[in-house]
């Protein structure tokens, strides 16, 4: 969703403490989220569409949907798609806390995450990732691949309500 935030924070500390000459020449490329897919492309010789999407918590799902559409449109036979996030840092926690976006159920963390409950009071920040290999159906059949599921569609929407809060009615 954010991409490279821990490195950005660490590099900012280096800059402030040791000056601009101590900044790694890899800082900018490493902070750009599409560099992960670029490195995979170079390492494994992958050719074809290569892009990165940033849509906060929905990034991984939107990447999978976009990959499915590229296959559907005939732009690729196989796509690697998904997302990963590792931004539990002091600055991230402070930012979400200042928005009052984090759950305050600190005494009962096992019940703090309840996104669809009427008594929800925020979210629980976490880290994780998930990657899928998507393949055009006939292409997979031709090579004898075991097919686990079929992606038949995806919906994208914005509720046009608030910068961080969902529309209470669920519209959008």
Predicted regions and their residues:
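Fold-level recognition of mixed alpha/beta catalytic cores in primary-metabolism enzymes, strongest
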Residues: 84-87, 93-101
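Condensing-enzyme catalytic core mediating Claisen C-C bond formation in acyl metabolism
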Residues: 107-172
């Amino acid at each position: 969703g954010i991409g490279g935030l821990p490195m950005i924070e660490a590099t900012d500390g280096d800059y402030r403490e040791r000056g601009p000459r101590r900044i790694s020449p890899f800082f900018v490329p490493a902070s750009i989220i599409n560099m992960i897919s670029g490195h995979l492309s170079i390492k494994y010789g992958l050719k074809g569409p290569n892009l990165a999407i940033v849509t906060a918590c929905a990034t991984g799902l939107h990447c999978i949907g976009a990959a499915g559409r590229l296959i559907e449109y005939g732009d690729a036979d196989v796509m690697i798609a998904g997302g990963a996030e590792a931004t539990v840092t002091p600055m991230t926690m402070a930012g979400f806390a200042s928005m009052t976006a984090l759950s305050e159920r600190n005494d009962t963390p096992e019940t703090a995450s309840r996104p669809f409950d009427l008594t929800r009071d925020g979210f629980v920040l976490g880290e994780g990732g998930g990657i899928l290999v998507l393949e055009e159906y006939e292409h997979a059949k031709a090579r004898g691949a075991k097919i686990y599921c079929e992606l038949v569609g995806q919906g994208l929407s914005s509720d046009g309500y608030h910068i961080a809060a969902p529309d209470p009615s669920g519209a959008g």
